[in-house]
């Protein structure tokens, strides 16, 4: 499949080191003891880690600022401050991390066990116990903690969609992907609203599925008519196809045949992929009758009816997509 890109920019900061402590030993029988100030704790690191079941960057928002915790200051009795908690940023496999300032790629995380420290936390300052000498028996100073660092980063994810939405222009693909995911595709009542692949993520507690709404298919796409080659290349490596058919239109029966024929003409493997036939616009006049006719004609196919207008069948469709992804 032509690789689709998802990207966002974030600002990350590692934690400051805690300050060293100025303290002197004070005991019942030793009121003028020596220095015993402990060291400050280390600031938290910024760590990027691949999480196996993530399929998108949707855990984060574009422009979000994220920071590790600062180290705690040192204490008396030579006690060191606690280290700051690391900031762990979970990303999907195939995520590249770029420095916004230079445009250079800093890290590439490809595999499920990949992990990288992007920024080290600041070192904790030394307590005054370290500065005692023969000439300075009561040092009344300690080191401040080292400051953490900040980076403006761009995360870029190479995506191969799990599900491809297949349908004629205005079949309702953009509206469907907006309904079943958090995505908002541009919707208008004319052909080729979707000029470029548009991605959404179906989220569940155990898995995410990436769904691609790509430019509408028309007859002759396999010969390059319309956005043909571009469209077919985008869906060639998806695991599941959703054939979206407008059953309120006059040509609903021929739409299925054209979709199958165009996919087969481009790549014989496309027409044999796991698929669901989804009859859309059941809320419109005559659509229910056409839907029943379509089901009778397509014995052996998974055929579901939906209405994006009133959400009829949407939950059933989402459940079926997750079920198919596990087969």
UniProtKB/Swiss-Prot annotation:
The lineage of its organism: Bacteria, Pseudomonadati, Spirochaetota, Spirochaetia, Spirochaetales. It comes from Borrelia hermsii (strain HS1 / DAH). Its main location: cytoplasm. Its EC number is 3.6.5.-. NCBIfam families: Obg_CgtA, PRK12299.1. The gene is obg. An essential GTPase which binds GTP, GDP and possibly (p)ppGpp with moderate affinity, with high nucleotide exchange rates and a fairly low GTP hydrolysis rate. Plays a role in control of the cell cycle, stress response, ribosome biogenesis and in those bacteria that undergo differentiation, in morphogenesis control. Its cofactor is Mg(2+). The keyword DNA repair does not apply. This is GTPase Obg.
């Amino acid at each position: 499949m032509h690789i689709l890109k998802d990207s966002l920019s974030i600002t990350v900061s590692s934690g400051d080191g805690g300050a060293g402590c100025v303290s002197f030993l004070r005991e019942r029988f030793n009121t003028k003891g020596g220095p015993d100030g402990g060291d400050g704790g280390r600031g938290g690191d910024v760590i990027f880690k691949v999480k196996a079941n993530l399929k998108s960057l949707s855990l984060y928002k574009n422009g979000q600022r994220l920071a590790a915790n600062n180290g705690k200051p040192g204490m008396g009795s030579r006690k060191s401050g606690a280290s700051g908690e690391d900031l762990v940023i979970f990303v999907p496999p195939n995520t590249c991390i770029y420095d916004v300032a230079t445009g250079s790629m800093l890290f590439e995380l490809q595999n499920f066990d990949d992990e990288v420290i992007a920024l080290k936390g600041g070192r904790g300052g030394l307590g005054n116990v370290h500065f005692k000498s023969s000439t300075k028996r009561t040092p009344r100073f300690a080191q401040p903690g080292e400051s953490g660092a900040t980076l403006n980063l761009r995360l870029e994810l190479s995506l191969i969609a799990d599900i491809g939405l297949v349908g004629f222009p205005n079949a309702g693909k953009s509206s469907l992907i907006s309904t079943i995911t958090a995505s908002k595709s541009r919707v208008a009542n004319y052909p080729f609203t979707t000029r470029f692949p548009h991605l959404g993520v179906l989220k569940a507690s155990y898995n995410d599925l990436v769904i691609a709404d790509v430019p509408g298919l028309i007859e002759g796409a396999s010969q390059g008519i319309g956005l043909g080659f571009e469209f077919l290349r985008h869906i060639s490596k998806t695991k599941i196809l959703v054939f979206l058919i407008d059953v309120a239109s006059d040509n609903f029966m021929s739409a299925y045949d054209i979709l199958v024929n165009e996919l087969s003409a481009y790549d014989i493997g496309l027409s044999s992929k796991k698929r669901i036939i989804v009859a859309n616009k059941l809320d419109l006049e005559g659509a229910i009758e056409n839907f029943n006719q379509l089901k009778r004609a397509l014995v052996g196919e998974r055929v579901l009816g939906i209405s994006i207008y009133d959400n009829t069948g949407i939950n059933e469709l989402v459940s079926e997509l997750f079920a198919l992804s596990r087969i």
